[in-house]
């Protein structure tokens, strides 16, 4: 049986907060089906609402459709994460669909920090992320995509997986669009997919792709962009082997992007967490605090 689920989230400052106090970010959610918020947490104080998103069935299979929307109002700061990996399982026919549409208002902040996405062999799925930033809005997000289960001898060699990451702003319609298709189902596309995964211009034989980005609804000053790039390139004494960035760029003056490839999730995730902490301190003067659920 396919699961149909939706979750609509809304974050706003508490209108009843004392004028001299840091406004509390209130997070509310309305859900249908299995997708829901575990609870609202405030480990950094009242101004930043941490939400842990859960999907009790534990994975996404053919025919499932999950839709998440988030609205972050002016003055609010929301951090969204998950307690475990998002898994797209093998499908016997129908494709699965997961979508996120987030709108961030002027003066609001959003952090989109889910744990890794695992795409099993034979999965047929589409994962679409869209972020709409008003002038003055800012966000920090990441995506860690892992193909198959190499440690268990499972290669991703069949199925079709499509993913898109889209950042829009009122100042510029499309500062950044990332779209990738890995299609083994169509015999016309399968050879192209094989070359993409093997080529040094593509995945270079790796099975894990990590992406971290900082984006603004207003063009970032060149000094600020350069500082974010330098912070991402800084050596990390605690980094595990295979976790060095392959590229840190500003493809548009609204966004800075870090990219890594690797054979395992853990070293890349460790590096993402380290750079995310640096960017958070640099851009927002916030401590590099991490959600507690990552330590469980």
UniProtKB/Swiss-Prot annotation:
Function: Required for maturation of urease via the functional incorporation of the urease nickel metallocenter.
Keywords noted in UniProt: Chaperone, Cytoplasm, Nickel insertion
InterPro entries in the cross-refs: UreD
Gene Ontology cellular component terms for the protein in this record: cytoplasm
Localisation: Cytoplasm
GO MF entry, a single one: nickel cation binding
UniProt-listed HAMAP family: UreD
Protein name: Urease accessory protein UreD
PANTHER family: UREASE ACCESSORY PROTEIN D (PTHR33643:SF1)
Binding partners and assembly: UreD, UreF and UreG form a complex that acts as a GTP-hydrolysis-dependent molecular chaperone, activating the urease apoprotein by helping to assemble the nickel containing metallocenter of UreC. The UreE protein probably delivers the nickel.
Family of this protein: Belongs to the UreD family.
